[in-house]
Structure formats: C-alpha cells, structure tokens
C-alpha cells in the first residue's frame, strides 16, 4: 500500500453556464495540484456546468458541450493527478447528476447521484434521474468513495 496519498480539494466557485471558464479554472487548479504532488484533485458537484443549472442542462447543445469539456479535461490532464469532477451524464435516455473520475487521459469511472433533493431551492427530482448506488473506485492502490452532496447524508450510499 502507498505510504501517502495526497488529495487536493478544489472548493472553488464555478459559474453556472460558463463551461469554458469552468474548464479553465479546473485546468489551473489541476496544474497547481500537480506541482505539489497530489494524486487526486477533487472538485465539487456539477463543477463543469456550475450548480444549479435548472433547465439549461436539458438543452442538448449545452449537455454535449459539457461532455466535450470533461473529455478535453481528461485528455489535457493525462499526466498527473487523477481528477474527480462533477458534471451531467446522459445514459440510456436518462440524465444524471454525476461525478467523473478522470485518469490517464480517459474517463475511468462515473458515479451517479442517488438521493436527489427536492425541497426549498432544490429541484433535482424534476431535472435528473436517480442513479444506482455506486461503490468505491480505484486510484492507484487506494479505494475511494465519493458520495455526491445529499448522498453523504444517507447511510445506504456508503460501503
């Protein structure tokens, strides 16, 4: 087992709808994490799109552009720390609030948010589909779990 595993937490302030700007912020943060020897940099929920996108995420052109930014980030950051970053996922005609694990120039794993809030300013049940509970993923020798926001408050999501 590794003697150390360094994680950089990138609790930044993405701008809703500014995919290119959020990509640039993520890339700059990744470069800083690489300089300090991190093994993983973790961004927030829906970082690439900003949170909360409301109906903007349902526009096919916006969703495709968000996916393109995630793929571009994976390729640009293939030599250095892995990336955990929030973004939308569209699988089998369902739209998910997802968390992408990027490593070695590829999407290594995708975690879907399971518990969707639906109170006060949160309207996720109208926008997203509920994902299956995802288990941990592997970064080098380490198994990591990344519950997405509300998921962290429910014991059924953790292993």
Residue ranges and their predicted role:
Residues 1-159:
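Enzyme catalytic cores with a strong preference for nitrogen-chemistry domains
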